[in-house]
UniProtKB/Swiss-Prot annotation:
Principal subcellular localisation of the protein: cytoplasm
BP-aspect Gene Ontology terms: protoporphyrinogen IX biosynthetic process
Localization: Cytoplasm
Modified residues (N6-(pyridoxal phosphate)lysine): 266
Enzyme class: isomerase
Gene Ontology cellular component annotations, sorted alphabetically: cytoplasm
Protein name: Glutamate-1-semialdehyde 2,1-aminomutase
Species of origin: Nitratidesulfovibrio vulgaris (strain DSM 19637 / Miyazaki F) (Desulfovibrio vulgaris)
The keyword Cytoplasm is assigned to this record: yes
Pathway terms, separated by semicolons: Porphyrin-containing compound metabolism; protoporphyrin-IX biosynthesis; 5-aminolevulinate from L-glutamyl-tRNA(Glu): step 2/2
């Protein structure tokens, strides 16, 4: 069935480390080989073998409008004809910046970069430069890209592959990364008691999406805001996943918490290689060339990504987020009932247009509880669902993503597939 994908994977393994350009794509966490994609449209992707799947990965989140949305595609095609890279400012940079600032309450100025990792590492550099402090608080199981400061006890592919420690990261960098369990305000307060004068920032996924989907408990985000204000540290919201997905104004608008700095990912470029970081104007003016904190990039503000971003945000701004959330909430409720009826422990966490299936009988509120989920059950679930045309994240520590392009028939296909599979505890 997947002969062409297998052939390409064998070739790739001789040329590319692990045969993939990002580790989780190797599907090692679900004991499978990766599928090679030929093309994608709307809620579906088609492999090089011609097999079509309902896609619940959506390029790991940014394709909220679905793949190859006609308005976004047209904007990209038009931009190509104007030139693919200038290395100089263009009007679309200004227009996209205006749209981002208009949407996000905590962003008064914004700097475009090329990835979520660039955004988070640049935001942390700015926080350190502004405060004159070195330490950062991050949460166990949260993933903020592959910059050195963020790899300690990280989620996403680091968790999926069970990579121990942080090989290649200097010990001094590791020592400057302070860890706390997600949703544990007491632990964060204790870190400030011990290291408060040295902490530059807290960085947090306001909704964790890289240990599976874990929601913030009541008061958690406000508590982080209060601790940062009290101790003169900056609060960084990593909204690479949540930005423009949980709300057009991001998690900061949904939860009414204003961070000092915000990081964004590929959704602001319609899935193209782009990211951004922004925040209070007084902080952002500390970045070169108007300030002393240096950050640069030849492809930052790339005209293709800017054009795609303008089109994407314009479409998202007029989309019905509440209706999509209601559909996904109903899907998650029904999916949990279907799987529970098979006699396996299961919890389905959901918010907005995301959900994660955890095969555990306890609430999942942090990475420790996420790891109680039965990985072997998830592997069986993944393989059987894939065999039935449902493309899920090849890791128990990622969220499923639903787009505005997913039809009721697409959601029904997932539920029908879940009914048809066999699981045993």
């Amino acid at each position: 069935m997947d002969h062409r994908s297998k052939e390409l994977f064998e070739r790739a393994q001789q040329l590319i480390p692990g045969g993939v350009n990002s580790p989780v794509r190797a599907c090692l966490g679900v004991d499978s080989d990766p599928l090679f994609v030929a093309h994608a449209k709307g809620s579906h992707l088609t492999t090089v073998d011609g097999t079509s799947f309902v896609d619940y990965v959506q390029s790991w989140g940014p394709m909220l409008l679905g793949h190859a949305h006609p308005v976004v595609a047209s904007a990209i095609h038009a931009a190509v004809d104007r030139g693919t890279s200038y290395g100089a400012p263009c009007e679309d940079e200004v227009v996209l910046a205006e749209a981002v600032i208009d949407a996000l309450p905590g962003v008064e100025m914004v700097r475009m970069v090329n990835s979520g990792t660039e955004a988070t590492m640049s935001a942390l550099r700015l926080a350190r430069g502004v405060t004159g402090r070195n330490k950062v608080v991050k949460f166990v199981g949260c993933y903020h890209g592959h910059a050195d400061a963020f790899l300690a006890s990280a989620g996403s592919g680091v968790a999926t592959l069970s990579i121990p420690g942080t090989p290649g990261v200097p010990e001094a960098t590791v020592r400057d990364t302070l860890l706390a369990p997600y949703n544990d305000l007491t632990a964060v307060a204790e870190l400030f008691t011990l290291h408060g004068k040295d902490i530059a920032a807290i960085i947090v996924e306001p909704v964790a999406g890289n240990m599976g989907l874990v929601l913030p408990m009541n008061g958690f985000l406000q508590g982080l805001r209060d601790l940062c204000t009290e101790h003169g540290a900056l609060l960084i919201f990593d909204e690479v996943i949540t930005g423009f997905r949980v709300n057009y104004g991001g998690a900061q608008k949904r939860f009414d918490i204003t961070p000092d700095l915000t990081t964004l990912g590929k959704i602001i470029g319609g899935g193209l290689p782009v990211g951004a970081y922004g925040g209070r104007a007084d902080l952002m003016r500390r970045i070169a060339p108007c300030g002393e904190v240096y950050q640069a990039g030849t492809l930052s503000g790339n005209p293709l990504a800017m054009a795609a971003g303008i089109a994407t945000l314009a479409e998202l701004k007029k989309s019905d987020y509440d209706a999509l959330e209601a559909r996904v909430a109903a899907l998650a409720t029904e999916l949990q009932a279907i799987l529970a009826a098979k006699g396996v422990p299961v919890r389905v966490n959901t918010i907005a247009s995301m959900f994660t299936v955890f095969f555990t009988d306890q609430p999942v509120t942090d990475f420790a509880s996420a790891k109680t989920a039965n990985a072997a059950l998830y592997t069986s679930y993944y393989k059987q669902m894939r065999d039935k045309g449902i493309y899920l994240a090849p890791s128990p520590f990622e969220a499923a993503m639903v787009s505005f392009a997913h039809t009721d028939a697409d959601l029904a296909a997932l539920l029908d597939a879940a009914r048809a599979i066999t699981l045993s505890a």
